[in-house]
């Protein structure tokens, strides 16, 4: 990895914002002749045939809904900034969901500002414009275009996103001087928040965050299409993993993680969350993302993974697979119990149902099996009332899905967990049973077995649709599917 050099101060650059400098470059400095040479000889690369983003109509409608909810108030929605990984390297950037949802843009340091007018709001997207060739920023700044790639010009950005664009470097000063009521989405851009520190309140800002979260509870057609794309790529990623299980046995869970990641990067933007590639007793650790354990024949592999599309929509799918292609009798018994619980949960997903219904339906089946197996004393109603099944079921049976894997997290309880399902909602149904390796309350043969089955379910007008139905779920179908992929 190369290192950017330091821009010398000249009369032309002395009053400008300093270029970000990186230390310890091999060149001691920049001669006046080189600095002058780098100013010219560059072709005009302005893009004139840009088309609007595919979701331009949807993002405009979302901004209109936001405007209607907060008339007369200035609204500030930042994308966020790069975060340092180490020294002068950064983590890959992912824009705030609120910003991406309203604009379609994914650029660091971007800010959407909606200025109140007599009939709504005037929208402006603030971005960093093209690198300036005159002051050397494009080649001497570590974030200049020569180092990290070409940016859109402001004119190009307007064409792509359908929003007037301005230079973000002018925004903080303008916000400091602004008057009138204002709300900001917090937690993404400290500089913007500092500029508004005496103009905003936590209570009003939280109302904005909650509203933006609840807007995403019901997905539009574009979002549903993106979620289906994410799921379809995820299915192919699971197929990839099955084909390399023999190689994973020779290495570790990391091989599985890397195999799925390749599919996510080839067909999408990234993985939607840290892949859980949990073999053997690691399947009993709900968020096992270290993925550094062995993969052994005879064990189960719990793979919980999802591809994220280029528009940030993610799948979230789990299958629990026999490493050698066939479940043992006990593994099958536990797996089939989880399958039956998931079937009951999915059947409860329909418009007008309470959000909690699918969780309750799945938990009842699991409690029945635990009583049947003699692992907990019945009757089932007592087990459910006291929550005794939770020693082995551990987690809720699902969550909303969208641009965040756990989507709409800021929504109010009454609209989410205590709410009612509506057509267009997308959620996961993911019951599980987990018998910890050190659980002395169950027979030894159960210990270290963990099973989860998870699918992405769309609420439709007359019921539901399993977006991930292309991946087999029944134990016999899983075995046949694996055999076909392994040849």
Task: Outline where the language-model segments fall.
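Active-site neighborhoods and metal-handling regions in enzymes and metal-associated proteins
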Residues: 1-487
